[in-house]
């Protein structure tokens, strides 16, 4: 359903954000 899509996109965005933070911290 629509909420499943929203949840999936939200999780993907969250993972990408955490990844970006980790990269920034590592540099």
Swiss-Prot record:
One annotated GO biological process: defense response
Pfam families with a match to the protein in the record: DD_K
Keywords, comma-separated and alphabetical: Amphibian defense peptide, Antimicrobial, Secreted
InterPro entries listed in its UniProt record: Dermaseptin_dom
Compartment list: Secreted
GO cellular component terms given for this protein: extracellular region
Tissue: Expressed by the skin glands.
Lineage: superkingdom: Eukaryota
Function field: Has antimicrobial activity.
Family (UniProt): Belongs to the frog skin active peptide (FSAP) family. Cruzioseptin subfamily.
Protein name as it appears in the record: Cruzioseptin-14
Source lineage: Eukaryota, Metazoa, Chordata, Craniata, Vertebrata
């Amino acid at each position: 359903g629509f909420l499943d899509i929203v949840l999936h996109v939200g999780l993907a965005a969250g993972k990408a954000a955490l990844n970006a933070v980790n990269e920034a911290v590592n540099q």
